[in-house]
């Protein structure tokens, strides 16, 4: 399944970046933008949010699910001092869960709908796809911060 390949590819690349040194983790992709460290923490939190949304739709049916404030997470969890090892563990576990859920539910239950508090009606399939594309979007930012060329997938 294409979604599983996308989830695996973005996972494998993301996990490599958790091993960077302090100077690379402090790099940003532009003035006033998040550092690689912040992006990695954000990816872990986003994986948890994607997981919660998908599980709620599978278990509780159509409902309104609220947007999460990524800047509030960065401040409230203090991304600057939060151990990156914690976020690595969260990211790896949440991605394993997402992959498991996608393997069993992407085709069979991908049509199930829910309502995003800002963007409206979405399907489970769209949320799985969003998790992979969101990860890829931030990987592109990390590559830019590190001076790496864009990847062609």
Predicted features and spans:
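N-terminal export signals and maturation junctions of secreted/periplasmic proteins
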Residues: 1-4
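Short, contiguous alpha-helical
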Residues: 24-70, 109-153
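Acidic/histidine-rich alpha-helical segments that form the ligand environment
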Residues: 6-10, 15-20, 74-112, 129
């Amino acid at each position: 399944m294409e979604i599983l390949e996308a989830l695996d590819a973005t996972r494998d690349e993301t996990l490599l970046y958790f091993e960077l040194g302090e100077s690379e983790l402090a790099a940003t992709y532009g003035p006033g933008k998040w550092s690689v460290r912040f992006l990695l923490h954000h990816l872990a939190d986003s994986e948890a949010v994607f997981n919660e949304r998908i599980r709620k739709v599978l278990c509780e049916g159509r409902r309104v699910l609220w947007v999460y404030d990524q800047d509030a997470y960065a401040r409230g969890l203090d991304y600057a001092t939060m151990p990156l090892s914690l976020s690595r563990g969260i990211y790896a576990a949440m991605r394993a869960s997402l992959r498991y859920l996608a393997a069993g539910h992407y085709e069979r239950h991908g049509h199930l709908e829910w309502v995003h508090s800002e963007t409206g009606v979405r399907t489970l399939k769209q949320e799985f796809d969003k998790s992979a594309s969101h990860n890829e979007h931030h990987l592109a930012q990390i590559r830019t911060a590190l001076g790496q060329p864009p990847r062609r997938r």
